[in-house]
């Protein structure tokens, strides 16, 4: 009976009793995705992918379309909420050793890359001043690729500069990629339930499991309610908190903003890019800041799965968190001392965490095995 399978999938799913609130972010991400697809559809109905009309169509949505302002703000701030949740979700995975479930981790990082691409394309669509220049700077990094760089950039732009074909294809990609995210999310969940969730102790929870519903579903519902409350408070009272003032002006290719920067959720990677005074080196560091997450399942040497009982790894983990926040902050500042030095030091610390995982695991094993 189909009813029985639905119950098995969502209700009778066996879950460890001791998983904490940090395991709630998966369901929150699913809610964010549903919200983004829904609001995105209503925005796409009224949006015009043309460089002369794009900015005006956004103004039309916010002013003339009934509840258009709410859809636009929910979509923009919902993206920020999406990234807050995904960064916490990844941090939890790093702390509790969830990356040892290799297939789930790999599909998750692929999801992150797809999400970042989707968000980047979406940031270009309003065709504001910062949208245009952020697109110019980031896509121009392709020219750093030896031999193929210039051809790749021209192919992506659809011409010799960012123009109407660029906006059209970015809109098409921004519309289609969320469906790839939905497919990858399904794969991610299937692979996760193949092995089952980890837990704060890192032990095998098979002897002590409870049904997902009603126990964990109610716990998920609490945090979902809090997240939606927080989202609607920002949308209602602080709708421009994440916006760049430059983006309220229509794109002008003849006027360069004083300080070009992407959305806040890309600033850590952008800060790493800016800290290297070489185009190719910076582009490689930018790519590696995400790709290095693929390495974590293969560099784990500790006998214990989570960092719960590993003080040295904990110290490095919280250094990574503070480093991430510091790079993000430094990337909002102009390229001048002391911000250049701060970006360079924090970039080194960021990569040091991933390089130190195997060494720290080995040291902690020695300490625990000591008589």
UniProtKB/Swiss-Prot annotation:
Cofactor or coenzyme needed: heme b
UniProt-recorded Gene Ontology molecular function terms: metal ion binding; ubiquinol-cytochrome-c reductase activity
Positions bound to heme b b566: 89, 188
Keywords associated with the record: Electron transport, Heme, Iron, Membrane, Metal-binding, Mitochondrion, Mitochondrion inner membrane, Respiratory chain, Transmembrane, Transmembrane helix, Transport, Ubiquinone
Chief location bin: mitochondrion
UniProt GO cellular component terms: mitochondrial inner membrane; respiratory chain complex III
BP GO annotations: mitochondrial electron transport, ubiquinol to cytochrome c
Residues reported in the UniProt entry to bind a ubiquinone: 193
Entry binding sites for heme b b562: 75, 174
Location in or out of the cell: Mitochondrion inner membrane
Transmembrane intervals: 25-45, 69-90, 105-125, 170-190, 218-238, 280-300, 312-332, 339-358
Membrane topology: Multi-pass membrane protein
Record Gene3D superfamilies: Cytochrome Bc1 Complex, Chain C (1.20.810.10)
Cofactor descriptive note: Binds 2 heme b groups non-covalently.
Alphabetized InterPro entries for the sequence: Cyt_b/b6_C, Cyt_b/b6_C_sf, Cyt_b/b6_N, Cytb/b6-like_sf, Cytochrome_b, Cytochrome_b_C_euk/bac, Cytochrome_b_N_euk/bac, Di-haem_cyt_TM
Protein family according to the UniProt entry: Belongs to the cytochrome b family.
Note: Heme 1 (or BL or b562) is low-potential and absorbs at about 562 nm, and heme 2 (or BH or b566) is high-potential and absorbs at about 566 nm.
PANTHER family per the UniProt record, alphabetical: CYTOCHROME B
Protein's job: Component of the ubiquinol-cytochrome c reductase complex (complex III or cytochrome b-c1 complex) that is part of the mitochondrial respiratory chain. The b-c1 complex mediates electron transfer from ubiquinol to cytochrome c. Contributes to the generation of a proton gradient across the mitochondrial membrane that is then used for ATP synthesis.
Subunit structure: The cytochrome bc1 complex contains 3 respiratory subunits (MT-CYB, CYC1 and UQCRFS1), 2 core proteins (UQCRC1 and UQCRC2) and probably 6 low-molecular weight proteins.
Protein name: Cytochrome b
Organism: Liasis mackloti savuensis
């Amino acid at each position: 009976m189909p009813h029985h399978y639905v119950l098995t999938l969502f209700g009778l799913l066996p879950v460890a009793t001791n998983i904490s609130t940090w395991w709630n972010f998966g369901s929150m991400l699913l809610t964010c995705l549903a919200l983004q697809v829904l609001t995105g559809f209503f925005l796409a109905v009224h949006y015009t992918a043309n460089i002369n009309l794009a900015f005006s169509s956004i103004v039309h949505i916010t002013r003339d379309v009934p509840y258009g302002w709410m859809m636009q703000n929910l979509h923009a701030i919902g993206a920020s909420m999406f990234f807050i949740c995904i960064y916490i979700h990844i941090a939890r995975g790093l702390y509790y050793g969830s990356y040892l479930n290799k297939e789930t981790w790999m599909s998750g990082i692929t999801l992150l890359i797809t999400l970042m691409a989707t968000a980047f394309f979406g940031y270009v669509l309003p065709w504001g001043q910062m949208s245009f220049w952020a697109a110019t700077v980031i896509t121009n990094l392709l020219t750093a690729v030896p031999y193929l760089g210039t051809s790749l950039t021209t192919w992506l732009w659809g011409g010799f500069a960012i123009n109407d074909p660029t906006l059209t294809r970015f809109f098409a990609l921004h519309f289609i990629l969320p469906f790839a995210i939905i497919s990858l999310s399904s794969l991610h969940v299937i692979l996760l339930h193949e092995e089952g969730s980890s837990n704060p102790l890192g032990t095998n929870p098979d002897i002590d499991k409870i049904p997902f519903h009603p126990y964990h579903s109610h716990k998920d519902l609490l945090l979902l309610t809090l997240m939606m409350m927080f989202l609607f408070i920002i949308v209602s009272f602080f709708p421009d908190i994440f916006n760049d003032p430059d983006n309220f002006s229509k794109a002008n290719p003849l006027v360069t903003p004083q300080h070009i920067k992407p959305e806040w959720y890309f600033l850590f990677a952008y800060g790493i890019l800016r800290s290297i005074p070489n185009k190719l080196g910076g582009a490689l560091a930018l790519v590696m800041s995400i790709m290095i997450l693929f390495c974590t399942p293969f560099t784990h040497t500790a006998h214990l799965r989570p960092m719960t009982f590993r003080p040295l790894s904990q110290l490095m983990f919280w250094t990574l968190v503070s480093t991430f926040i510091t790079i993000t902050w430094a990337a909002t500042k102009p390229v001048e001392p002391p911000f250049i030095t701060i970006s360079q030091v924090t970039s080194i610390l960021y990569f040091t965490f991933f390089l130190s995982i195997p060494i720290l695991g080995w040291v902690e094993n020695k300490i625990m095995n000591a008589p």
